[in-house]
Amino acid sequence: MAIQKVFARQIYDSRGNPTVEVDLTTETGIHRAIVPSGASTGIWEALEMRDGDKTKWGGKGVLKAVGNVNNIIAPAVVKANLDVTDQKAADEFLLKLDGTENKSKLGANAILGVSMAICRAGAAQKKLPLWKYIAENFGTKGPYVLPVPSFNVLNGGSHAGGDLAFQEFMILPTGAPSFSEAMRWGAETYHTLKSIAKKRYGSSAGNVGDEGGIAPDLQTPQEALDLIVEAINKAGYEGKIKIGLDVASSEFYVDGKYDLDIKAAKPKPENKLTYQQLTDLYVELSKKYPIVSIEDPFDQDDWSAWTHMKAETDFQIVGDDLTVTNVKRLRTAIDKKCANALLLKVNQIGSVTESLNAVRMSYEAGWGVMVSHRSGETADTFISHLTVGIGAGQLKSGAPCRSERLAKYNELLRIEEELGSEGVYAGAHAGKYIKAAKF
């Protein structure tokens, strides 16, 4: 089916920053996609094109990317008479049109918006739900897996104020019998956590960060973990909810060491750790708290640190800034035995096909996959369908708070309802591809 029209516009994300929205028209209607944006971004990510005009939106406008869609991509894809049901060919056309390795000519945010809209148009042409269309393209067979939600309930790092260097503290309801029950458990634990934090640290401790998690003024990861474990137990889910961390350690990697006091007014020299010391800290924390998954435990280019931790521990070790959903980086990480799970962010690489290629490579290597939102999000629910379509079994989309986060979780509730007996909840098998992980 031919593409009749492509039109992009600048809209706003959950942080009030500009982002790209694309409308793609075929005879089945208008198919819309909105591109997210990250705060802690890996240096190896595909180029997110911003205008750089400091007099408007602090330089974060995306009118150049919008212009590239409307003036370059749109006429080219209409003229090429692309088949929207051939995602691979459509994405290859877009990549060739850009012609650079990191999408610096047109912008990954321009290309991705069109790629996602084409995927939605393909699903409509095939008269399939988006998750089913992705599943058929990827080769996923039923029963279809509903993911364990990784709720980012407590924020630190670049997502919040306070001295806490670690960026995300997540709860994973692995013991729940269904996705809908996992949502209930997560919401109840989140509200319990917020109540405890406000009583202990004052009402401002209930204020939320970019991803909906609370952001109390804490000094150490132990303080954060103590709060979370107390909330889990008080909510009645002791032993049934696990903990995941996104350390985002590239953000506090300075001169070959990891500075846990990088945000502190009075930093202590003893809190500048080697990668061996930081590994020991993770192991020590896991003995006291039910931690099963650690994302970006080290800097994106500190390869030896990753290899060391993978050899010495049995965590799910998730590569985000390390791999940036890029098959070249991913292949290196696999060969070096750096991790055992990929964090999948479609805007890191900039097209649907390249994202699926990274998933396929991960599965073939025995890795798990956790699909992820970005801190600057929108109401777009593409990643909910992607998660089910590829059978990932894990999704992180922030806390059960803020509508741009709940949009993804609520869409999964609808998919669960639609699937009925064809759907299974990943639960304790979320890390099913990872033999060593402690799920």
Curated annotation (Swiss-Prot):
One of its GO terms (molecular function) is magnesium ion binding. Substrate binds at H159, E168, E295, D320, S372, H373, R374, S375, K396. Transmembrane segments: none annotated. It is found in: Cytoplasm. The modification Phosphoserine is found at S249, S250, S351, S355, S421. The modification Phosphotyrosine is found at Y253. This is Enolase 1-1. One of its GO terms (biological process) is glycolytic process. Its EC number is 4.2.1.11. Homodimer. HAMAP family: Enolase (MF_00318). Gene3D superfamilies: Enolase-like C-terminal domain (3.20.20.120), Enolase-like, N-terminal domain (3.30.390.10). Its cofactor is Mg(2+). It comes from Schizosaccharomyces pombe (strain 972 / ATCC 24843) (Fission yeast). It comes from the Eukaryota.
